């Protein structure tokens, strides 16, 4: 197999059918594993209609957790490229979606896929937009300048099988995506960011859902930092340019919201942010500043 795709679901998903339809029309050698913990009665009946060629459903009557589900299904797979997708995302209608990922993975160990949020008029929508914008900026900077990054956004990313096995898969931690990316980073993995392919992330419509998600992120990041800060500090002292983009990945809301409130133009904000970070890191970089600005408009 060229690529193995993994979609963990808790309860149910109203987007997985569209994802499976898209993948069925992709002209690559593929296999898809959908692990469902505690499926609802409605979704259990729907699963029968979703089964197709090279699509395997793993049904768990109890909640085993995302890390366990992914590790188990990876063990059943054979693809050299492992693509991990959350069940609450939307994919573009691109007949070469998987082919582009496979091509990009020929030159990297971990691929962070571009996340897009449609900026609506609500405050939550705007806040989520700036959060994911910062994720994309961080990944692009890390990919373009260092080809390394200690974090990844787990809603959509790919990893080579040999690197997955090298770090012994996911661990049962709150932030399993950042954790596996950090362990791969410490194993000197290559990191890349793709603008060719993207996913669209869901923006929660009420404060309770938003708060629950952000609380989980905050706890996960705190526990991650407590476990890894010593080892990462040794690397960051040698290469501080890896650390600065990571700050915006881990704490996007505060940084982005504050600066966007002070500087009304997002284009101007991007310009000042990149110029400030890299002019402090390396005196040879400012000549690339204007080239940076042009690139950032592609976010």
Where do the model's predicted regions map?
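Short, acidic, metal-binding catalytic loop of nucleotide-sugar glycosyltransferases
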Residues: 21-30
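A conserved acidic beta->alpha catalytic loop
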Residues: 35-45, 62, 89
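Long helical/loop segments within the catalytic core of UDP-sugar-dependent glycosyltransferases
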Residues: 68-69, 100-166, 171
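Short aromatic/hydrophobic "clamp" motif used to bind/position activated sugar donors
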Residues: 82
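Catalytic donor/gating beta->alpha subdomain of glycosyltransferases that bind UDP-sugars
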Residues: 109-136, 172-173, 182-245
